[in-house]
Structures are given as C-alpha cells and as structure tokens.
C-alpha cells in the first residue's frame, strides 16, 4: 500500500507514531488476506449489526419530485443507527488480533463514539472517547449513551472544542499509550493506513448497493450521492462504483449558513491543500495555514478537512463535490420524515437535499442512489430548537 492517492494522503506524523502505523499497516494487510478474520468480520456485520441493509425505493418521494427514481441505502438501520459500526467492528477485531487491551476514539456527533463504545463493550475492552466540549453540549444524549455502554468520555477544552481538537487529543493519548492502546479512527482521515483501512471496512455499503440495484433494476444507477464530512460513508458507497465510469459520484458538503458567510464546513468548495492530522488534503485554513473554525447544523459534518481519497477523486474529476446549506438540509429532513416516514440524520439530509434538487431535472428513466448514512433520532433536539419547539 503506497498510502498516497495522487498527491494526497501520506504519513505526516512524529517518529513516535511511525512505528505504530507500520505495525498497524502490516497487521491490517495480514488480516485482510486471512479468511478467518474476514469471516469473523462478516459474521458480526450480519449477526450483530443486521447487514445487509435494504436498498429502499423511495416511491412517495420519487412521485412528489416527479423525476428520477430515488433509492435510499438504509445505513440508518444498522445497530447504533449509522454506518459507523461497519468500520468500528473491523478495527476492534483488528485491535483484538493485535492483543491491544484498550481502545480510544474521537467523536464529533457522538455516533462514532457510540459505535466504538458499543463494540468495545461486546468485546470486553476498555474504552475512552475524546469529544470536544462544544460537541458534548450539542450531543448530550450520545454522551450519556457512551457512558451507559461503559466508556469513559473525556471532554476536550482546547481549540474550538470540536472534532479537530478531539482528534488531536486522541493522537496525544495514543502516542503515550502506544503499546496497549488501539486508536479507532472514525472516518477516512488521518495518516496512512487509516484512510484505506476505513474505506475497506466501509465498502460493504457500496458492494451491497451495487448488487441490490442490479437485482432491482437490472442496471447500475446514474448517480450515487452521499454527504461528506471526513467522508467515510461516501467513500464506502463510492468505492465499488469507481471503475463504472457511467455512474456519477456526488459528495455533498455542509454549506452551513452559506458558502460565502465563513460559517460552513465545505473544505472542497472553499479549502486549499495542506496538512492536518497526518495527511495531505483539502483544508479550510487561512494564509498562514491555521485551521479555520468550521460550522454546520450537523455535528458530524463540521470537520475542517476531507479524506485524502476524496481530494484525489475531486482532482481527477472522478467525483463531483457540491454543498447544501443548513436550511436545505432541514427542509430535506422534514420532507423525508413526512413523505416516507423515515427520519434521517442531519448529515444524510445534506445528501438528500442535493438529490431532491437534482431529481426533478432528470427523467423517470434515471436512477439515483442516496446513501442514508444514519437515522435522525440524535438530531430531534437540534431540529426542535430551530423550529422553536420546547422539548
């Protein structure tokens, strides 16, 4: 594995971390070739997380929009309510294989933290989750959930108290406790081999979706659309379609209050190339290379960078990256809830918002797959607040 996607990716880390990354890459490569390991991974995806997830034809929404057929890849139906568990099960099985006793993770929306705490509980491992102080306030429900699952939740006060700061803190902990600790990264970010490893554990989404659409429609979709924060749900559904040039891949970033306001998280639209968290990629940074504060209504999208493979897909024109505002995501959130009886995560609602713009301009013969990366239970408080409803 080269660890590079074109010029992106790499391992921009201190010496202290290098040995751990080399060990991790070696063990991951071995595990991937090991039939027993992959069999065990698939067993837990099936029996514990409930895969395969359905590819659901959103008939009401399709009729309402009057254009392309919209299918939803129902990652919201996974155990713990999002795609995160696909990756966590893989990494924690790897940690077990490497005889690590403790796992740590960063979390923004709390979904990755919950998934990590969940799997750690099942495999009987000690678990500590680092979470920005601001995110802790926004996601109190998920914080309590992690504690219920036996994890220790450590607030991160430095910087803006959000995801980027939680990652920094997790890396610091990992360096200190490298011998017995496994760092479970939650997205296709960080130094090599993480972006590749997370993608490989998430590609089950796209592998299933491809098989399912061929069964249902006898052909591949015209568009595959997914939201992009760090970008693991998107990379997971995109990857199996990359060689199918006729399938357009569209990543949707968070435009927050608007792309020109400075209150957004659209690293592809407004960022420049730099280095963060051990990787070279597109980042929201100032002239001096300082990371700028990011914002989105959805805590899971407010990451100031994007996975390096996405940066490469953009630069090589294989995928297109667009954005949706808070307002558009909220409208899509309400629409899906009321037309299909499915409450989506605010993250996924960004992808849906773009699909809902696109569909009416296409014909009834066109097919769109939207990755519904998570369910919206965690966001009900946020939405109520925006609507001025006291809970």
Curated annotation (Swiss-Prot):
Highest taxon of the lineage: Bacteria
Cofactor(s) listed: pyridoxal 5'-phosphate
Family annotation (CDD domains): Trp-synth_B
Cited InterPro entries: Trp_synth_b_CS, Trp_synth_beta, Trp_synth_beta/beta-like, TrpB-like_PALP, TrpB-like_PALP_sf
GO molecular function per UniProt: tryptophan synthase activity
NCBIfam families registered for this protein in UniProt: trpB (TIGR00263)
Purpose of the protein: The beta subunit is responsible for the synthesis of L-tryptophan from indole and L-serine.
Protein name: Tryptophan synthase beta chain
Native organism: Thermoanaerobacter sp. (strain X514)
Lineage, top ranks: Bacteria, Bacillati, Bacillota, Clostridia, Thermoanaerobacterales
Gene name tied to this protein: trpB
């Amino acid at each position: 594995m080269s660890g590079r996607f074109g010029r992106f990716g790499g391992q921009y880390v201190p010496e202290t971390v290098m040995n751990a990354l080399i060990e991790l890459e070696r063990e991951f490569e071995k595990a991937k070739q090991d039939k027993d390991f992959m069999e065990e991974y698939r067993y837990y995806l099936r029996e514990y997380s409930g895969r395969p997830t359905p590819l659901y034809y959103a008939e009401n929404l399709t009729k309402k929009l009057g254009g392309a057929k919209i299918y939803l890849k129902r990652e919201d139906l996974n155990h713990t309510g999002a795609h995160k568990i696909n990756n966590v099960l893989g990494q924690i099985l790897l940690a077990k294989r490497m005889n690590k006793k403790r796992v740590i993770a960063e979390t923004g929306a709390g979904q990755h933290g919950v998934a990590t705490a969940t799997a750690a509980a099942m495999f009987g491992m000690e678990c500590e989750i680092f979470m920005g102080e601001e995110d802790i306030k926004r996601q109190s429900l998920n914080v309590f959930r992690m504690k219920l699952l036996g994890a220790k939740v450590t607030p991160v006060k430095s910087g803006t108290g959000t995801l980027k700061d939680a990652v920094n803190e997790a890396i610091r902990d990992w360096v200190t406790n490298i011998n017995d600790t496994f760092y479970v990264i939650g997205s296709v970010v960080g130094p090599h081999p993480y972006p590749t490893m997370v993608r490989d554990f998430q590609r089950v989404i796209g592998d299933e979706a491809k098989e399912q659409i061929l069964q249902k429609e006898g052909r591949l979709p015209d568009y595959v659309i997914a939201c992009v924060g760090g970008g693991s749900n998107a990379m997971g559904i995109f990857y199996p379609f990359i060689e199918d040039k006729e399938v357009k891949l569209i990543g949707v970033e968070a435009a927050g209050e608007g792309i020109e306001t400075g209150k957004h998280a659209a690293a592809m639209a407004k960022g420049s190339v730099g280095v963060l968290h051990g990787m070279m990629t597109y980042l929201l940074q100032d002239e001096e290379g300082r990371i700028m504060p990011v914002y989105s209504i959805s805590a899971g999208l407010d990451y100031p960078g994007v996975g390096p493979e996405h940066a490469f897909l953009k630069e090589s024109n294989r995928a297109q990256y667009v954005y949706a505002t808070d307002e558009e995501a909220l409208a899509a959130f309400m629409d899906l809830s009321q037309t299909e009886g499915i409450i989506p995560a605010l993250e996924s609602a960004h992808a849906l918002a773009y699909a809902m713009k696109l569909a009416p301009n296409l014909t009834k013969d066109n097919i769109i797959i939207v990755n519904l990366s998570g369910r919206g239970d965690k966001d009900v408080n946020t939405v109520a607040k925006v609507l001025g409803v006291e809970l």
